[in-house]
């Protein structure tokens, strides 16, 4: 089942990233400083997109899996699609959330892109449960540095 879902998840993330890179805003100087401290290499590629709700996958199988794992819900405040970051409107300007999502950007870079990141992140979520995976805990630790 995982090997069926992974390509769907990769395509969905690629589509989301394209939209965010097209419509999103570049980081401002304060946000760039946070990104530098988080260790992102490609600072100029990052875009933020303010949304009323973080979108869910349209594919029914992928949507059901994301909801069952607790990865995306109406309560999701942010989501990173490699260099594109969705930020829910009521969290716009929240430094901690931004730092958390930027930590995921750094993880995408470190792990080598969308497929390697999703393979590891989703495997951790399935094995340890969300939000107990190593990558998510790393992002939570980064978030705390910017409280």
Describe the residue ranges of each PLM region.
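Metalloprotease/metallohydrolase-associated module, dominated by Zn2+-dependent proteases
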Residues: 1-44, 50-56, 61-80, 86-92, ...
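Short alpha-helix carrying the canonical HExxH Zn2+-binding catalytic motif
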Residues: 91-107
